[in-house]
Amino acid sequence: MQDVTLPAMILLGTLGAASLMVWGLIGSRIRQGGPVISGTTLPLPRVHWISAVLVLSWVTMQLMVLASAPSSDGVKVPDLVDVQALCLFSGVLFLALLIPLVSQEQPETSGFGFDLRDWRRQAWLGVLGFLGCVVPVIAAWSTTLPWRTPTSQHGLLQLLEHDDSLLSLAWIVLAAVVLAPLLEELMYRVILQTWLQRIAPPREALLAVAVVFAAVHRLPDAVPLFPLALILGYLYQQTRSFLTVVVTHMLFNATNLALAVM
């Protein structure tokens, strides 16, 4: 394990304290008998079959690749061209998933959470969601320390260690902080969780998506990402806000990137 720098310790300490405050508020709401977040009254929309097939195919392919890969293999370090290609692919896939959902054949578009009329509240809930995930994620991450090596960390973080130029950093920010949250929240929360919730109880749908989301990120990262996925799933289930879960995910990825830079 690398030495933790003073700026990183300050950032983690500040976020940890804020996270404990959020959990204190959550505990207070639970003791009062109220919901942590009031549930949405929006009807559950139907997921367009094209979007559902694309997501199920992608997830199946990812899980098959992980299952066939030797557990001892380290994470492949991409180069800048790989990151640029990843950004292009992510943007194209995002549009391919989004367009069927908002097409004229889908009258229930608002139920997917794309309504921004109350964007300030949605964004603030995303910030609170991020703060709420800090302590559980750190606790889960600490259990994986014996299995962590320099080659097991995310490929983009390894690239940053080899090439810390502003150009590389800009592309990594675009890939990890902007495009990855947009695409993954559309895939896992908006499409997969909504689709599952129409055929299974809400709690089981949330749990299943959280397991899949964590699994596709492979070990050891899957362990700390599981509580993050549970929180993201709960946020989306209660608010049905795409902006809320994207803000939470963006802040999480941005924090990981900032810690790597520090």
Stretches with model-predicted labels:
Residues 88-93, 174, 223-227, 231:
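Membrane-embedded alpha-helical segments of multi-pass membrane proteins
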